[in-house]
Amino acid sequence: MRGRIDRVDTSDGMALVIDYKSGKRVDSYKVGSWEAENRFQAALYMLVVERLLGLRAAGGVYVPLGKSDTPRGMVAEDVDELGSDFKDNDRLPPEEFRAKLDWALGQVRDADARMRGGELGCDPDQCAWNGGCMYPSICRCES
């Protein structure tokens, strides 16, 4: 796994992680769909910020470039300093916020354990953002 955090805004020991998206509507990035769509990028970035920078993760959002969509993701409902540019259903109470971060960490640990155990199953529907295998000549996945 690899990734690059686009932006981290900090204030008073807290951090808001921002991931810019181009060409996509970010409504599909609402926190309510993260588990169903196995979408843990922003949560993982928040964990990295906590661990490496020693800051409290106060939110992780996907921001559209060149569109007027509202940022989507998750923000801590107890942090007013983030402003009001977020949908109410992306604001989570502290225990739910932490549970999403724990879920993301569990996903990464589970993937790591499977890879270390030699399990490299193919899943063409999840392979590329629009479905379909990215490397059909080497994938060996049977249709």
Predicted regions and their residues:
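RecB-family 4Fe-4S metal-dependent nuclease core
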Residues: 1-143
